[in-house]
Amino acid sequence: MKITDVRIRLKDEEKLKGIASITIDECFVVHDIKVIEGRDGLFVSMPNKKNAEGAHKDIAHPIKTETRMELQATVLNAYKKALEEAKAE
């Protein structure tokens, strides 16, 4: 699996800092990946839906730890680049 494109929409909310869409292998897109500011810094939250009990359940997510780490690093790098570009404007 290769992430071939990342698009970031910057947000300036208390915890929500951005929303990403990624393209995998130039043929599959995942939207609404959130960039969140947590207690220990930035992290990526996969698209999710609230169930009947009020808990959030991921709609799509990596199964392997290595894949999750790669996805998070790629999205956070794109977020930081988008933030730098926005500050330069």
Task: Label each residue range with its predicted role.
Residues M1-E89:
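Single-stranded nucleic acid-binding surfaces, predominantly the OB-fold ssDNA-binding core
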